[in-house]
């Protein structure tokens, strides 16, 4: 295609690109109506020639129309390929029919020829060239596609399109594709496998198969029935064997053809050779006379009688349905009256209860031995039960009673578990040996559980019993372990009598010796006046009476150079400050009473809450309104501090180590009892927390005897 030819095409015809989809429909109409529209084409061609010069400068002014046309051509590419191919076929016919009248027609025809040339010259692989050439060439034919009735409308549209500019021509449109031809060699063809069917077997392979099987040509259809000889050969093939001869070649061929008909080609190839060898062996051994004799023994084949369809009866569906028949005896109703169990009735017609079974009597040892010895001696019969019973009575007197009880169970177990000896299997066990063995056994004691039926045993085991533990309640405590309380006439429990002997009043030396054990080393036994038992009791009483002085004296003694005699003197003076021990009223009460008293919530008056509870020693302080205060302890303290260290009181020397109990040195001997008890109550209060009421009670009790 030359660039001059593309320029000669009017711009208005090039801009008719959007009408490309309608080109295929009106292609044939353009050929038929072309002679009728010669006048219109001549007029339009003149108009296009005049405005072709105006369209060229407009091509550069409006470049935006190019992408619009390119998008339309790209979307309609598939339609253009088919249309161009058809237009190329119709082009020679159009050229022959069109008369060569005017140069204006030649221009339009030249545009059509250019489109045809581009379509023909383009090769199948030139896809780019087709896209470029279709855009200017195809719109030429869109002009005469319109029918004759719409000629005025087409002219108006053409005039309107002429005002628009054409697409810019680029160098790519002028370039031609010079590369190799593009072809699509891929094609899907179905190739059948060789030998899958008989038709696909090559002729050379058929000749090889025919030679191998001994078949020269295609098998002929043998519709003849098999004779008696052939049937005999077929039946007797499994019974005979021998060397092959040339007598039975015809039967081989006929039988092989039958096999070929029934089987496929693959099975014929593998199965035919062994059949030939086998049948050659069979036919040689049998002679014709033997075959004739064998065939004569067989009768003639009788034709099967044809079935008479009239004799066949149709089965009704209703009768053919399955019916469920009850078996005899499956239900109680189906049991015949003769076989039914009739319960035994009494005179009144009530059924009689079955008699209770007699309890089996305890078997003797001899009976058990007889039962056990049956396996060893099968020929021996059972003896009468009377004979062994007499012997068991004799065995009672002979065997001692204690031995019989111990031997009874152990001997039976040994008999049951002992393995059979091989010597006993040969002969029978003599009766004397069995009797001697029975005499050595004691009498079996009757088990009380043997008489019970099995059901009762199972029920007893299956029951779940809730048993109270021993001692869980007071009722379950055995009487030997119960605590018996001694009560008086009123029913109140009596206090146990004091078993301890009342100790004589303790001297100061004894108390000092008991208290000074922790401070000094071991003393001689001659210094003590009482025995060791009384000393231990006295020490425990002193400790319980004065807890403040004893419990808090945990500090180690000073390592001084004083002698033991000085310590004894100091302890003697310290013991003088202690009062005499008073009996505790709560000491003899039982433990149960103490627990009950503690559990009860009682209101007790606090010390000093009322005037009655104030101790008499402190009442004068309230009467004097706090003016008179005890000045004696500080005066003593000041006097003692003025004394030299050598003349110091031994009580102060000992009490210096007791940091937690300084009240003993400050108080006088007259008020020593009250203050020591107060110090004990004050020391117990922070430890026990909520036990201040009990301490107040003790102070009240100590104050009352003083008032008396």
Curated annotation (Swiss-Prot):
One of its GO terms (cellular component) is cytoplasm. Residues 1-187, 212-404, 416-527, 543-708 are annotated as: Disordered. Residues 1-15, 68-77, 543-553, 661-671 have a biased composition (Polar residues). Specific inhibition of calpain (calcium-dependent cysteine protease). Plays a key role in postmortem tenderization of meat and have been proposed to be involved in muscle protein degradation in living tissue. It comes from the Eukaryota. Belongs to the protease inhibitor I27 (calpastatin) family. Each of the four flexible inhibitory domains can inhibit one calcium-bound calpain molecule by occupying both sides of the active site. This is Calpastatin. The gene is CAST. GO terms for molecular function: cadherin binding; calcium-dependent cysteine-type endopeptidase inhibitor activity; endopeptidase inhibitor activity; RNA binding. The modification Phosphoserine is found at residues 87, 133, 222, 243, 364, 366, 373, 440, 516, 527, 563, 575, 577. GO terms for biological process: negative regulation of type B pancreatic cell apoptotic process; presynaptic active zone organization. Inhibitory domain repeats lie at residues 170-222, 304-356, 446-499, 583-636. Residues 679-689 have a biased composition (Low complexity). Residues 21-30 have a biased composition (Basic residues). The keyword DNA damage does not apply. It is linked to Peeling skin with leukonychia, acral punctate keratoses, cheilitis, and knuckle pads: An autosomal recessive disease characterized by generalized, continuous shedding of the outer layers of the epidermis, leukonychia, acral punctate keratosis, cheilitis, knuckle pads with multiple hyperkeratotic micropapules involving the interphalangeal joints, and palmoplantar keratoderma. The N-terminus is blocked. The modification Phosphothreonine is found at residue 135.
